[in-house]
């Protein structure tokens, strides 16, 4: 664990000058003043065994209408922006890739990748018209590196759709259900994702709460 005042580069935007934000029980959180990300002290991130054990408790049935409705916050605006017959990647799809099923039913081809449940690294060597990242970015141990990777897999003009619960008031952070998930190690605001997009010269819009659509230049 880093001593108080020992700053580190932001893992989201790589800016210097992050500072300690809040200590809650045995977990210490840092804040970046540049992109407004909040992140868990890197020394306290869970290991892969702990992560997998937690993920196995997730019950995301691809046929569950309630789960599909939840995902529609991203799928609806993404589908409205895509031309017919695109090829995409569901990055961090988990054990029940419901979003991929929705997009496939809409006429698109969707590859799957998840480091635990669909670890097909060949999927990472291809380029796509769109990439979705739903309920995944909060698990990133190295967010800047991950967004660089995602951008590298997008074709010119390709779209990245991100869905993660945006942090709101700092006063609510300690009791926030999203923070209490032990595998959630980084928290974004809409402004955070706007910085991520701007650094890579992508366009940015947030068509719904907790959703961002970014487009790589054509």
Regions found by a protein language model. Give the residues of each.
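A short glycine-rich, Lys/Arg-flanked "PGG" loop and its adjoining helix->strand segment in the class I
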Residues: 147-156
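Conserved N-terminal segment of class I S-adenosyl-L-methionine
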Residues: 1-130, 134, 147, 163, ...
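A short His-aromatic
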Residues: 135-139
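Short N-terminal helix/helix-N-cap motif within the alpha/beta-hydrolase-1
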Residues: 141-145
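Short, glycine-/aromatic-enriched active-site segment of Class I SAM-dependent methyltransferases
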Residues: 163-186, 191-192
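Low-complexity, intrinsically disordered Gly/Pro/Thr-rich segments
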Residues: 189-202
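Residue-level detector of anion-binding/catalytic polar loops
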Residues: 109, 159, 203
């Amino acid at each position: 664990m880093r001593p108080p005042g020992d700053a580190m580069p932001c893992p989201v935007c790589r800016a210097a000058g992050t500072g300690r934000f809040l200590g809650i029980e045995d977990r210490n959180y840092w804040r970046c003043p540049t992109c407004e990300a909040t992140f868990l002290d890197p020394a306290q991130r869970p290991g892969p065994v702990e992560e997998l054990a937690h993920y196995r408790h997730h019950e995301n049935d691809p046929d569950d209408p309630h789960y599909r409705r939840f995902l529609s916050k991203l799928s609806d605006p993404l589908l409205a922006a895509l031309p017919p017959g695109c090829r995409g990647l569901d990055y961090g799809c988990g054990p029940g890739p419901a979003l991929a099923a929705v997009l496939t039913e809409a006429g698109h081809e969707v590859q799957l990748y998840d480091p635990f449940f669909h670890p097909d690294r060949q999927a990472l060597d291809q380029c796509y018209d769109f990439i979705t990242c739903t309920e995944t970015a909060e698990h990133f141990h190295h967010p800047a590196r991950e967004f660089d990777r995602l951008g590298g897999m997008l074709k010119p003009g390709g779209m990245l759709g991100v869905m993660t619960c945006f942090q709101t008031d700092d006063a609510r952070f300690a009791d926030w259900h999203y923070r209490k998930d032990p595998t959630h190690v980084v928290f974004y605001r809409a402004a955070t994702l706007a910085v991520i997009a701007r650094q890579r010269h992508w366009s940015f819009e947030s068509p719904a709460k907790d959703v961002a659509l970014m487009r790589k230049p054509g």
